[in-house]
Amino acid sequence: MAARPNNIGIKAIELYFPSQCVDQAELEKFDGVSAGKYTIGLGQTRMSFCDDREDIYSLTLTTVSSLLRKYNIDPKSIGRLEVGTETLLDKSKSCKTVLMQLFEPCGNTNIEGVDTVNACYGGTNALFNTLNWMESSAWDGRNAIVVAGDIALYKKGNARPTGGAGCVAMLIGPDAPLVIEPGLRGSFVKHAYDFYKADLTSEYPLVDGQYSIKCYTEAVDKCYEAYNGREKTLKSQANGHSNGVDAAQEAPLDRFDYMCFHAPTCKLVSKSYARLLYNDYLADPTNELFKEVPAELKDLSYEASITDKTVEKTFMGLAKKRFAQRVQPSIQVPTMCGNMYCASVYASLVSLISNVSSADFQGKRVGIFSYGSGLASSLFSLKVKGSTEEITKNLNLQERLDARRVVAPEVYDEMCNLREKAHLQKDFKPKGSVDTILPNTYYLTNVDDMFRREYEVKKE
């Protein structure tokens, strides 16, 4: 058995987003809504999308092959591969099995893991499963890859501008620069019909928008409470020498130097960060930090607090400076690409890595909040214990975002229609152009009369 691993975490990370996007300000005009509804009200700038040439198999194949290539990873060195997605093409065959095409040529078929599904939470569950594997007697000494990706698409209406598409692949192993703090996380899971996909004939979800925001907010509260409780337990077990809140910090929230959130919209992220500060206020209303907070807010019922505009406005104001320093660097991809469902929170981490220099990042703690409707959620954290320079260089984020083709809303609408027509089709050839697809990207060429899908890779 391999020696027990230390400092397990993220050793490398790759992000893929389609080469085309639509401008949200143009979409506002096209949809006939007031200026700023999407750009200010939702906090969204652009939205990634794909036509019928790309699907979840092609997205994950592109992302994992790119991770292997950019970091010169030997496919034989991977002992586990797990995928988190809610974009299902098959009710039986996993996306992970499709990815085995990248490992079979070298003879590596001894790779554990399949898919894990629960709305936008699947990637986090895949990560937790992988950490558990690496800490267990089942670990054989090899690294693992966790994949999180989705195509987020809504029918015409209010929710359509909150779509997006993208995929993240992470190399997980010991002695990582981004170390997941062991044993330190809090989760909240409950039964809720806030967003679900019970209509298997449609690619579109059934959504109760306001209820889903309420569920997300409750999950923020409960995960923070559970994380704090777990931290206290670990601290007491370590005789007060671990995971404590520094006396110099104004509030418990300050123990996170940065935070990443699952980002259905960037506006919800800013509200949720402020909500954590509200939780700190309830725990210690006499703290000097909260001296301007109206006294009556501490006596609100829990239900009322979730939708109370005074609570929201007061704590967004109080959190504004902290948000700019600690969360703003993480929302570059969410605002420029939209919601990637399972990949969303890890795209936030990609943004953070790309926007904070490796030198400034050292020793910092990052809080990560993951949410999936239905619902499952967790708050966990990582510590930066090594250089992130190579990751930043390989991501080349800003240049890649800038290189995308921005299309008119009319074109985006056509692409959505193409996807709608392609859904559940067999004996089918995609209609989308391959000219817009970038080199080294997988794309769909054919679906035969037994629904078997065939792909090609765009050549350099």
Swiss-Prot record:
GO terms for biological process: acetyl-CoA metabolic process; ergosterol biosynthetic process; farnesyl diphosphate biosynthetic process, mevalonate pathway. Keywords: Transferase, Virulence. Signal peptide: none annotated. It is an enzyme of class 2 (transferase). It catalyses: acetoacetyl-CoA + acetyl-CoA + H2O = (3S)-3-hydroxy-3-methylglutaryl-CoA + CoA + H(+). The keyword Transferase applies. Its EC number is 2.3.3.10. Transmembrane segments: none annotated. InterPro entries: HMG_CoA_synt_AS (IPR000590), HMG_CoA_synt_C_dom (IPR013746), HMG_CoA_synth_N (IPR013528), HMG_CoA_synthase_euk (IPR010122), Thiolase-like (IPR016039). Pathway: Siderophore biosynthesis. The active site is at E86, C120, H262. GO terms for molecular function: hydroxymethylglutaryl-CoA synthase activity. (3S)-3-hydroxy-3-methylglutaryl-CoA binds at A35, C120, N158, T162, S212, H262, K271, N339, S373. Gene3D superfamilies: 3.40.47.10. The keyword Transferase applies. Hydroxymethylglutaryl-CoA synthase involved in the biosynthesis of a ferrichrome A-like siderophors which may contribute to organismal virulence. The first step of siderophore biosynthesis is performed by the HMG-CoA synthase (HMGS) MYCGRDRAFT_54740 which catalyzes the generation of HMG-CoA and CoA using acetoacetyl-CoA and acetyl-CoA as substrates. The enoyl-CoA isomerase/hydratase MYCGRDRAFT_76805 then catalyzes the conversion of HMG-CoA to methylglutaconyl-CoA. Belongs to the thiolase-like superfamily. HMG-CoA synthase family. PANTHER family: 3-HYDROXY-3-METHYLGLUTARYL COENZYME A SYNTHASE, HYDROXYMETHYLGLUTARYL-COA SYNTHASE. This is Hydroxymethylglutaryl-CoA synthase MYCGRDRAFT_54740. It comes from Zymoseptoria tritici (strain CBS 115943 / IPO323).
